[in-house]
Amino acid sequence: MLKSKYSDGFFSIDKENGFLPLAEPLRQLPEAYTDLQTLIDQMPIEREDGSKGLLHTEGAFEKAVLQIENHLEQVKSEKDPFVRAALFRAYSFVCSAYTLAPAHHHFIANGTYGKAHRTVPKNIAQPFAEVADQLGQFPFLDYHYSYSLGNYYKINPDGGFNWENLGMAAKFSGMSDERGFIMLHVDINQYSPQLIEGSMGIVHAQDDEEMNHHLELVGTALKHMNARRRLMWEASRWKHYNDFRVFIMGVKGNTDIFDEGLIYEGVWDEPKAFRGQTGAQDNIIPTADIISGVVDFYPENQLTQYLMDLRQYRPVCVQDFLKDLKESSTGSAGTIARLKASNNQKGLQLLLKILEEIYLFRNGHWQFVQKYIMSNTAYPKATGGTPITSWIPNQIKAVLSAMTTVDQLTEDGAHGFDKKEWKVRFEKKVQLLNKQLEIVQVPSFNPEDVFKLNAALGLNDA
Ligand code: HEM
């Protein structure tokens, strides 16, 4: 049964808050953690006042980390969800910066990542594992509590959620491209309340009118999200992605950097390997995939397993929401099946518009990967540990398959639907992907050849 709200006291997945926290996250830790807060403030390569921070100088951050008091007992007594979230954020930043600092300096000197430190010191590992346990999370930098949604503050408190008005409470590089990159994720989520309202409305709709109203709501939310997403090209310059990328790398899947894992001193005897921070932990596309039925077209392969694995890297309340949403929209309760059963032609067309937005999101996102990653580095693994060139396009194929199925149910001319025109646009999408996949199959391919095709077929995102 789908509930109207899913909350852990920090997030509340409902039509008021969407996927954003209930209120602005704490910018600073409580006084008992002053040494830790000072470390966070002094950490970025470039600090707020323009001076060089600890990560700028090789070895300086690691030295400072060892001076921090072990706050394990204090952390055990914390009950406030906002304090817990801010502590998780602080410790996860310290953990990633500490372990990956050598890889960062190796990259600056040699252009390759080199090795990370393999041990998280006890004074960080123990309180981090404790707060992670309280939140039901793995002790590693994540998207919700750490790097993105739980890491913003409004520069002008009366202003909105556009990325220009958002600052990062904790940062690695401290440069404007890092802020633009991750705060745009928060910005895009300002439309998630409508996405939730529409999705819940679709599940509960009693007739075509209610169904179509909520399909329209989802389509409009996704359209706004796509318009904001496209601003990535200016919010964060692709050539500067490597300034901060190394710090969000995960352990799992990145054995070149971390070997067989990380030792959490004083917590576990054996090494652990958790996945890294990635937009793949965001909830917009998973929600849209479930409600539109794209999820039923996911290929049965390792990528799908990876996306499902990432469910565990989300707050428990988000996991519950996605699980219930899926259970409420499966089989004959699925949106496509219900639209087919009532031959709701208007609804089918609204669903095609939703699928178009999911396609534009994924195709634009694939172009991010081509430019921000493939044009910048030969390292083929993403921060989440996936082989990027083969996996990302796979999900575009799932969208194209869902589109074909829905198109087969639509009638030419119903409510002015022009099937022929739709087909022409659809074929371009298929052609683009096939040609791009052909290029990336050659081991020494040139990323620019992949990117140029987007404009050639009129599907350029920038
Ligand atoms: C410069 C911008 C971006 C780059 C370079 C990028 C890169 C990537 C990469 C490499 C993956 C593969 C999985 C992994 O991490 O191992 C991925 C997956 C994903 N990313 Fe991003 N990403 C960007 C922006 C975004 C934004 C703004 C969102 C949404 C708010 C997002 C949502 C997703 C989703 C949902 C997936 C899972 C794959 C799918 O379902 O299609 N990404 N991203």
Q: Predicted regions span which residues?
A:
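Surface-exposed peri-terminal alpha-helical interaction modules
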Residues: 1-462
